[in-house]
Amino acid sequence: MSCITTNNVKRLIILIIFVVIIWQFYYYASSKHNNNFLNEKIAIVPHDIKCLFNQPNCSEADVDGWSLVQAFIYFVVGLIIPNKYLIIIIVSIILEILKPFIGYEPKYIIGPLLNTTGYIVGSMLSPCKNNYKEKYQIFE
């Protein structure tokens, strides 16, 4: 039995839309007061790692609240649609490449690493994992 059903995909799309709407409302409201706690640095990444490609403003590419929110979204995706690692890595890299075009600062190394880590953890904890013991009868 596979857990990738039409209902799960619909729920995932609704969840992502809901999170993006809340994200935008919060960002708009907090930008007026300049106290957006999600912009606070949580972990400082070594300069050689975050500036691997020498992109502009790479020195600000540390782990912040927004990075963890994205990792949490990927965690939820991993719970609902597990074991699609290559697709998740490609999507994560493409989104980081597109960020400068929509006005966000990209984190070319840290973003995909955190997103993939969130997805892997969600995928490992997913109740939708294939049961290879029953499917292939190789373990007894």
UniProtKB/Swiss-Prot annotation:
Keyword set includes Glycoprotein: yes
Glycosylation sites: 57, 115
Highest taxon listed in the record's lineage: Viruses
Compartment(s) where it occurs, according to its Swiss-Prot or TrEMBL record: Membrane
TM regions (residue ranges): 12-32, 75-95
Membrane topology per record: Multi-pass membrane protein
Keywords linked to the UniProt accession: Glycoprotein, Membrane, Transmembrane, Transmembrane helix
Keyword set includes Transmembrane helix: yes
GO cellular component, one term: membrane
Entry protein name: Uncharacterized protein R495
Species of origin: Acanthamoeba polyphaga mimivirus (APMV)
